[in-house]
Amino acid sequence: MEGEGVQPLDENLENGSRPRFKWKKTLRLVVSGIKGAGMLLCFIYVCLQLSSSPAKDPPIQRLRGAVTRCEDGQLFISSYKNEYQTMEVQNNSVVIKCDGLYIIYLKGSFFQEVKIDLHFREDHNPISIPMLNDGRRIVFTVVASLAFKDKVYLTVNAPDTLCEHLQINDGELIVVQLTPGYCAPEGSYHSTVNQVPL
């Protein structure tokens, strides 16, 4: 009675579990090979990314300039020379080379009553800047969407005084890019815009 129809334990292991064990071992080898190949591909990708030079974002565009006098109906803007200035002034206009949102800040005091308009695009109406102290003081901030080839400049109208005789105290213009966008390659602005000789 002992052992009728029941195989001994040693025979059961030899007959049934060995093929299953070989299948698991083969499956583990295949999975390990795939993992190893995946790790190798990831390593190669990381090495290629580190070896290639990263795309350099253009610096944030900014300008701080003094508004000192009036010339030909426009306020004269002279930029301070330092390493933080990334924009330039041409013909009393701040040249925009990169698309994006910009904050424009203007302050100053005048000895006469004046009206100032902010211009930045040829086909748009200028922004009439509100004045304080009977048109003699200005503290103005605006956020504008500017694009490549735009020019920021200020026109002034003084009812009782010629432009060249306006007296300006503590005038300052600050233009700072808030959101980076498309930037024209260096030198492209000079070749695409007609310059007016002084």
UniProtKB/Swiss-Prot annotation:
Report the subcellular localization: Membrane
Q: Which CDD domains match?
A: TNF (cd00184)
**What is the disulfide pattern of this chain?**
70-163, 98-183
The entry annotates sugar attachment on 91
List the GO biological process terms.
Answer: acute inflammatory response; blood vessel development; CD4-positive, alpha-beta T cell costimulation; cellular response to lipopolysaccharide; cellular response to nitrogen dioxide; cellular response to prostaglandin E stimulus; cholesterol metabolic process; defense response to nematode
> What membrane topology is given?
Single-pass type II membrane protein
- THD domain location is 59-176
**Transmembrane regions listed in the UniProt entry:** 29-50
In the UniProt record, the signal sequence range is none
Query: Entry's PROSITE patterns?
Result: THD_1, THD_2
Give residue spans on the Extracellular membrane side. 51-198
Cited PANTHER family: OX40 LIGAND (PTHR17534), TUMOR NECROSIS FACTOR LIGAND SUPERFAMILY MEMBER 4 (PTHR17534:SF4)
Q: Which family does it belong to?
A: Belongs to the tumor necrosis factor family.
Query: Tell me, how does this one assemble?
Result: Homotrimer.
Say what the protein does: Cytokine that binds to TNFRSF4. Co-stimulates T-cell proliferation and cytokine production.
The protein here is known as Tumor necrosis factor ligand superfamily member 4
Which organism's genome codes for this protein? Mus musculus (Mouse)
Gene name tied to this protein: Tnfsf4
